[in-house]
């Protein structure tokens, strides 16, 4: 891995990733046995298993804005899920100081049969907000999502764009020090995307830490100064974003338009 020198640290890391590895199985019918849970995690992979991430290490300090780049299937989303503690590593460790606002698989935590109102209270509550805090922010959440006419509509009847709007509006109101954003800015209309951009800029201005996974270089350059380049599950470059993108584009040149 290439690590570029950086300025001397001014604060303790908010994220420590040390020697992290995680295995998956290509054959979904395959299941790990109970015995596998206690097996040596460093053992050789079984047939059908592969390392989605292997021996990944880095630290992140408060206020850093990090773009994660790489081809599809190289471990970018898996890395964010590890930081969010949605999944656990097979090897190594992930330490996160404080909470995480996860804008990953953004509509996954919502309940189809509940109304928008109930989903706002449920999702925000699961992320640690009190009822009083949700009461105080409810109107601004709905106003941001621009769905006031659908507050008492079951979530399953919303369009896909509306679902993304309400999910972003809720998660972006969490007062967590770390923000994880995985391709969610690729959906929705142009005006709402710009609204999301401004909200992320507000969060960064508050000193939050950002992880952004995106194939849109313009988005990465807008928000991020540091880049992590993942390839075949390995962290092959950690340094300035411009150099991470240059390395990535050199290794995998864009295909010419047909």
What are these regions (language model features)?
Residues 1-52, 241-256:
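Pre-NBD coupling/linker segments of ABC/ABC-like ATPases
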Residues 34-41, 121, 133-150, 167-169:
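Conserved ABC ATPase "signature" region
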Residues 69-71:
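The feature captures the beta-strand-to-loop junction immediately N-terminal to the Walker
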Residues 214-215:
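H-loop/switch region of ABC-family ATPase nucleotide-binding domains
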Residues 222-229:
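Conserved catalytic segment of ABC-fold P-loop ATPases
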Residues 232-233, 248:
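Conserved ABC ATPase "signature" C-loop
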């Amino acid at each position: 891995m290439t690590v570029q020198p950086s300025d001397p640290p001014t604060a303790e890391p908010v994220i420590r990733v040390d020697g992290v590895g995680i295995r998956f199985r290509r054959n979904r019918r395959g299941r790990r046995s109970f015995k596998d849970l206690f097996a040596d995690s460093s053992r050789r992979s079984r047939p059908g298993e592969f390392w989605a991430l292997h021996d990944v290490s880095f630290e992140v300090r408060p206020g850093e804005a990090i773009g994660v780049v790489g081809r599809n299937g190289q471990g970018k989303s898996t890395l964010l899920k590890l930081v969010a503690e949605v999944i656990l590593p097979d090897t190594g460790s992930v330490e996160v100081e404080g909470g995480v606002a996860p804008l990953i698989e953004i509509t996954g935590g919502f309940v189809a049969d509940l109304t928008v109102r109930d989903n706002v209270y449920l999702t925000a509550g699961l992320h640690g907000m009190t009822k009083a805090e949700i009461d105080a922010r409810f109107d601004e959440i709905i106003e941001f999502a621009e769905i006031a006419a659908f507050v008492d509509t079951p979530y399953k009847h919303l369009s896909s764009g509306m679902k993304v709007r309400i999910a972003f509006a809720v998660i972006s109101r969490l007062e967590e020090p770390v923000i994880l954003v995985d391709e969610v800015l690729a959906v929705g209309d142009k005006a709402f995307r710009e609204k999301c951009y401004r909200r992320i800029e507000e969060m960064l201005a508050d000193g939050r830490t950002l992880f952004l996974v995106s194939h849109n270089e313009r988005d990465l350059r807008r928000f991020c100064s540091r880049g992590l380049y993942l390839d075949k599950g390995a962290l092959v470059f950690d340094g300035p974003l411009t150099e991470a993108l240059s390395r990535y584009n050199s290794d995998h040149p864009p295909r010419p338009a047909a």
